[in-house]
Amino acid sequence: MMDNKLDAACDKFTEVIELDPNWAEAWNKRATVLYLMGKYELSQADIDKVLMIEKRHFGALTGQGLVQTALKNYQKAIDSYVEAHKVHPFMKSPMIMMEKLQIELQKQSI
């Protein structure tokens, strides 16, 4: 049932994007749905579009961190969280994620 709802949500956000392709939040919402569906590359493509429209979009930057973590691109994920922290320095989640990812990078280098 959840898959059907995600498919429907993706379709609706696609319709919204077709109506207004310059609305960053529509791209960001579809990126979120695609991430939840496990379609990480497609999610990243939508995030790229969001960041072309609004380079300081906090949600897209943190979402990119999640996508890159899922793809095991830990350094790219860290870079995304660094940018998110610059945009929203009082939000703690990017710092927490950066610390966790630094540990993953250290494990990889052993």
PLM feature spans:
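Alpha-helical tetratricopeptide repeat
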Residues: 1-110
